């Protein structure tokens, strides 16, 4: 019983760390997507500015 209680605590801690890591990865992906979106807008503006010159 003691072993299962300890392993339960370890699993709980492991799951918590995995959740934190997943949230950090999600945040990083979201930031990268935002950066790519801004770059895409800038490139579109640069390419379309040639049409008006």
Swiss-Prot record:
Keyword annotations from UniProtKB, A to Z: Cell membrane, Developmental protein, Glycoprotein, Membrane, Transmembrane, Transmembrane helix
What are its GO biological-process terms? Answer: negative regulation of cell population proliferation; shoot system development
Could you name the Gene Ontology cellular component terms for this entry? plasma membrane
| Residues bearing glycans | 5
- Region Required for DVL/RTFL small polypeptide activity: which residues? 20-51
TM segment ranges: 30-47
What is the membrane topology listed in the Swiss-Prot or TrEMBL record? Single-pass membrane protein
Q: What does this protein do?
A: Small polypeptide acting as a regulatory molecule which coordinates cellular responses required for differentiation, growth and development, probably by restricting polar cell proliferation in lateral organs and coordinating socket cell recruitment and differentiation at trichome sites.
Report the protein name in the record. Answer: Small polypeptide DEVIL 21
Taxonomic source organism: Arabidopsis thaliana
């Amino acid at each position: 019983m003691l072993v299962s209680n300890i392993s339960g605590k370890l699993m709980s801690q492991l799951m918590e760390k995995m959740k934190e890591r997943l949230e950090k990865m999600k945040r990083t992906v979201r930031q990268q997507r935002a950066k790519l979106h801004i770059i895409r807008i800038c490139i579109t503006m640069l390419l379309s500015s040639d049409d008006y010159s």
